[in-house]
Amino acid sequence: MGKYAKNARNPAKSCRARGSNLRVHFKNTRETAKTIKRMPLRRAIQFLKNVQDKQECVPFRRFNGGVGRCAQAKQWGTTQGRWPIKSAQFLLELLRNAESNAEFKGLDSDRLFIEHIQVNRAPCLRRRTYRAHGRINPYMSSPCHIEVILTEKQKYVGKVSHDDSQKKKVSKKKLARQKEKMMRE
């Protein structure tokens, strides 16, 4: 079992999954993972399916050189976006793996959200392409490592409001004026 970059806040209420040396572009996968971070699990799965169907785009913020503009990126507050289908497929498989790990632990999959997702570069794989005049150029691939931690949302209990405990705050000036008014009467 590999080491994770981050530990879960509550290990009893969280599950994790990881993939190493995945043959999928690092830059596209990083942008896709950044988009689904902090999303509820159901929404993230639906988003990745929509990306595969080109119904929603992945906004490109860091690795956006030469990325075209699309209207679907407006909902993310940017103009550049793409539909990295292979990255979405790999992330979808990883989320399904993490979800099955959560079910094995007895967690409620409807209350899970993506607490941590990280994409790291893996060692490049080298191939060659043949060019004119007998030259050879490198034909590199940029694989990546992905890790994800899902955590169950906690139920927050709101404070009970008491009418007698919530008194209207009055400034010193206003108190002095009220006392002065009472003295006159």
UniProtKB/Swiss-Prot annotation:
The lineage of its organism: Eukaryota, Metazoa, Ecdysozoa, Arthropoda, Hexapoda. Residues 160-185 are annotated as: Disordered. GO terms for biological process: cytoplasmic translation. HAMAP family: Ribosomal_uL22_A. GO terms for molecular function: structural constituent of ribosome. NCBIfam families: PRK04223.1 (NF003260), uL22_arch_euk (TIGR01038). One of its GO terms (cellular component) is cytosolic large ribosomal subunit. This is Large ribosomal subunit protein uL22. Belongs to the universal ribosomal protein uL22 family. Pfam families: Ribosomal_L22. Coiled coil: none annotated. InterPro entries: Ribosomal_uL22, Ribosomal_uL22_CS, Ribosomal_uL22_euk/arc, Ribosomal_uL22_sf. It comes from the Eukaryota. Keywords: Ribonucleoprotein, Ribosomal protein. PROSITE patterns: RIBOSOMAL_L22.
